[in-house]
């Protein structure tokens, strides 16, 4: 009977150890995936900020061109009178 108890405790102990190791590896994998997701998010954020900057510059250039065109049209209209 004592032999069975020792064997059972040994099996339970080894099972707990292996379970602990598996959980640790799982946590490490989740941490690695989280880091990869963070890196991808940072890359996307950087890309969107660049696109936003380019869009702002394009809008400024378009507004400036439209302003010049409007000023030219007004100048022509005033000059014709």
Curated annotation (Swiss-Prot):
Residue span of region Hinge region that separates the two alpha-helices that constitute the peptide: 54-55
Ranges of biased composition (kind: Acidic residues): 30-40
Annotated positions of the Valine amide modification: 78
GO CC, alphabetical: extracellular region; membrane; other organism cell membrane
Post-translational modification: Amidation permits an increased antimicrobial activity against some microorganisms such as T.album and S.cerevisiae.
Protein name stated in the entry: Dermaseptin-B2
Compartments, as annotated in UniProt: Secreted; Target cell membrane
Written domain comment of the UniProt record: Has a helix-hinge-helix structural motif.
Family note: Belongs to the frog skin active peptide (FSAP) family. Dermaseptin subfamily.
Swiss-Prot/TrEMBL GO biological process terms: defense response to fungus; defense response to Gram-negative bacterium; defense response to Gram-positive bacterium; innate immune response; killing of cells of another organism
Stretches the record annotates as Disordered: 24-46
Short name of any one Pfam family annotated for the protein: FSAP_sig_propep
Tissue expression: Expressed by the skin glands.
Keywords (A to Z) from UniProt: Amidation, Amphibian defense peptide, Antibiotic, Antimicrobial, Cleavage on pair of basic residues, Fungicide, Immunity, Innate immunity, Membrane, Secreted, Signal, Target cell membrane, Target membrane
Propeptide: 23-43, 80-81
Keyword RNA-binding: no
Coiled-coil regions listed in the entry: none
Single Gene Ontology MF annotation: guanyl-nucleotide exchange factor activity
Function: Cationic amphipathic alpha-helical antimicrobial peptide with potent activity against Gram-negative and Gram-positive bacteria, fungi and protozoa. Acts in a synergistic effect in combination with Plasticin-B1 at doses that are not active alone. Acts by disturbing membrane functions.
The organism's place on the tree of life at top rank: Eukaryota
Keyword Cell division found: no
Name of the encoding gene: ADR
Principal place of residence: secreted
Gene source species: Phyllomedusa bicolor (Two-colored leaf frog)
Signal peptide: 1-22
